[in-house]
């Protein structure tokens, strides 16, 4: 279902009483929850948000990988790995300079581009990486390697 249909469904069903909209993870971290809130506000519909735990760190935790670690990574940065074609805005030059953990969400199909752009902008080819698919579910897969073989690791997930 496309987002516009989801928004319309929320508005239509709310006219009949309480509606619960369940989303995996945090609805405001690349979850399009903001768009749903706007649709509700525009239709004068009251709502309540109960945020979930975001996959931007929970998937790594399930693999035993901390996104921050004293002396290693004192910050983490969440980036979409799934930009609209022709509307790319990720600043790989700035990302390559960061010393914290880079978390790309929904980036399996873009892994080769992500790897190439980071390396082209100065990130070490030996930077450790993990590729996680279906995080925090019974189907979760996690493989690790380096930035050089990120694309090959991602292909193991498909």
Predicted regions span which residues?
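Short beta->alpha connector loops at strand-helix junctions that form conserved
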Residues: 1, 51-52, 107
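Short glycine-cluster motifs
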Residues: 12-82
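A contiguous loop/helix-start segment that scaffolds small-molecule binding in enzyme catalytic cores
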Residues: 5, 15-20, 32, 38, ...
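A cross-family phosphate/adenosyl-ligand binding-site feature
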Residues: 1-11
């Amino acid at each position: 279902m496309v987002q516009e249909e989801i928004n319309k469904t929320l508005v239509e069903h709310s006219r009949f009483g309480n509606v619960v909209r369940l989303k995996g993870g945090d609805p405001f971290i690349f979850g399009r929850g903001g768009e749903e809130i706007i649709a509700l506000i525009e239709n004068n519909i009251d709502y309540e948000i109960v945020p979930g735990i975001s996959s931007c760190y929970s998937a790594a935790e399930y693999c035993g990988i901390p996104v921050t670690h004293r002396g290693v990574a004192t910050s983490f940065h969440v980036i979409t790995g799934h930009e609209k074609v022709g509307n790319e805005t990720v600043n790989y030059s700035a990302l390559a300079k960061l010393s914290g953990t880079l978390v790309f969400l929904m980036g399996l199909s873009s892994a080769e581009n992500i790897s190439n752009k980071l390396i082209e902008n100065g990130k070490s080819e030996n930077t450790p990486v993990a590729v996680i698919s279906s995080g925090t579910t019974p189907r979760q897969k996690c493989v690790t390697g380096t930035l050089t073989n990120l694309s090959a690791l991602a292909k193991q997930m498909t």
